[in-house]
Amino acid sequence: MSYFENFQKILYDPVGNNNPKLMTNIMKRVRMRANMKKEVVMLDPYDVQENETPEIVADKHHGSPIYHWVVMLLNDISDVNHDWVKSTRQLQKYLTDKYTVTQLSEAHHYEISQSSGDTSIKIQVLQGTSGATTVTNYEYEVALNEEKRTIDLLRNEYLGFFEDEFQNLV
């Protein structure tokens, strides 16, 4: 099943000349239920590899690139250019388009580590805070990109149920 296959068709007159066309209602949005995302038995964590697209991941995991929409919907990805992990080459281009060479090494923010038991987290703090480390624009952007690398994949035994649920929602 393709993503838009079950979307409602509407009459739309884009020009306003009283000659409407039958079109797929692409404005319809479907979100995964919060309780379904909590069902970890249905999901497998996956680390997206270099140059993998949602289509490649879907093909590897679900056996067909047509299920890329499942990968994207499950991970709240609406724009693959902004929400999906960038390859090294894409990230470098993005950084050179956004920053000058000097700006890349400038401070983005400062942070400290806080630990409690076995857990350690980073907290942003003001410049000059004792023990704070500088995070450059480059380090910040790389970390932001890496956060997108780990995604959830639907286990194949739930794929049919997921498609049925999707069809009911659209």
Q: Where does each model-flagged region fall?
A:
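Cell-surface/extracellular proteins and modules involved
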Residues: 1-170
